[in-house]
């Protein structure tokens, strides 16, 4: 505990300051500032709670030891409390370890079809639905920012915004950040008349979304903004105005589109959110060689050989190749039951970080 003492003292002081700020009505007149303070408060609350539990357990242990000195029947309680103190101390040390600074963030998620033509586009749509259902299970909000559909209703590409339901240290990014990469599917395509199993792939990109676009420096002169005719809500062709927006960031070549909002202004605002997320990720890549390697490994090309996960329909099996994870509940996974897999990925990531410290 001596190593964590300075850190916990700083956290306790910050906790008290945040508590006072949250009680100030003036803070809530600025929703953005209130959200930022609330999120930080939620991030450090588990640390403070664990610290208080640890201090209480230490007090109980000291008292039990004094009683055990006169009465041997208290020896068992001393053993139990010794274990409890050790567990809480380990928990506190873990909570104080550096975290991914984006864990509390919302995300922008892109799904792109790859090799496999129509079958790949259909699989990309299956992946998008899987993430949407997972988000629904957690009470998160999903907004479809734009999509390009294939002839059979698949997605050539689709961009989603997924937002959490409140301030939490474990936000959307903390759960979905490992999804970037190439996803491979093995199944009999609907276009296959001979019943043969085919292999195709789709790619996923995930970006933490900044709280505000203003957090990312974007020069208006670096943007080319095009407007074009949107198909309207539900693809019924009811929108006859040029409301869809395509923004090209000229220095990087990044292109984002948004067509699902009701007005050109709303589509532009959404597209700017996506652009800010992608530029933030790019800046962090360039600032850190490790981050660059991580991001590059998400998806170089949507190629069947560069895969992070395989979805095998004939065997109802899912396999994540990064951690040798396998399960035979593909149908449930595609329905959004992803937490066991995400827990395994988070545990592997934590172990890797501990080995690198």
UniProtKB/Swiss-Prot annotation:
GO terms for molecular function: translation release factor activity, codon specific. InterPro entries: PCRF, Pep_chain_release_fac_I, Pep_chain_release_fac_I_sf, Prokaryotic/Mito_RF, RF-1. Methylated by PrmC. Methylation increases the termination efficiency of RF1. Keywords: Cytoplasm, Methylation, Protein biosynthesis. The modification N5-methylglutamine is found at residue 236. It is found in: Cytoplasm. SMART domains: PCRF. Its main location: cytoplasm. GO terms for cellular component: cytoplasm. Peptide chain release factor 1 directs the termination of translation in response to the peptide chain termination codons UAG and UAA. Belongs to the prokaryotic/mitochondrial release factor family. This is Peptide chain release factor 1.
């Amino acid at each position: 505990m001596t190593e964590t003492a300075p850190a916990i003292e700083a956290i306790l002081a910050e906790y008290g300051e945040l508590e006072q700020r949250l009680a100030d009505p003036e803070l809530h007149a600025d929703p953005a500032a209130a959200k930022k303070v609330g999120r930080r408060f939620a991030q450090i609350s588990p640390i403070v709670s664990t610290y208080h539990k640890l201090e209480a357990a230490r007090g109980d242990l000291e008292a039990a030891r004094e009683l055990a000195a006169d009465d041997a029947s208290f020896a068992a309680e001393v053993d139990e409390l010794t274990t409890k103190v050790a567990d809480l101390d380990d928990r506190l040390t873990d909570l104080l370890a550096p975290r991914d600074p984006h864990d509390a963030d919302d995300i922008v998620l892109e799904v792109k079809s790859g090799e496999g033509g129509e079958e790949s586009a259909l699989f990309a749509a299956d992946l998008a639905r899987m993430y949407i259902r997972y988000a629904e299970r957690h009470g998160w909000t999903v907004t479809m920012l734009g999509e390009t559909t294939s002839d059979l209703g698949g997605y050539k590409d689709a961009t989603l915004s997924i937002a959490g339901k409140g301030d939490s240290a474990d936000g959307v990014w903390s759960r979905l950040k490992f999804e970037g990469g190439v996803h491979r599917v093995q199944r009999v395509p609907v276009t296959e008349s001979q019943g043969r199993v085919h292999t195709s792939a789709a790619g996923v990109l995930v970006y933490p979304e900044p709280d505000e676009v203003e957090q990312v420096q974007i020069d208006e002169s670096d943007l080319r903004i095009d407007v074009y005719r949107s198909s309207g809500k539900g693809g019924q062709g009811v929108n006859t105005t040029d409301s869809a927006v395509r923004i090209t960031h000229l220095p990087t070549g990044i292109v984002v589109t948004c067509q699902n909002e009701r007005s050109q202004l709303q589509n532009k605002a959404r597209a700017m959110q996506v652009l800010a997320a992608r530029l933030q990720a790019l800046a962090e890549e360039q600032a850190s060689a490790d981050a660059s390697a991580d991001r590059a490994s998400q998806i170089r090309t949507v190629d069947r050989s560069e895969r992070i996960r395989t979805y095998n329909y004939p065997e109802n099996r899912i396999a994540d190749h990064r951690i040798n994870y396998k399960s035979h509940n593909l149908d449930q996974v595609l329905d959004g039951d992803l937490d066991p897999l995400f827990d395994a990925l988070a545990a592997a990531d934590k172990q890797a970080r501990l080995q690198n410290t």
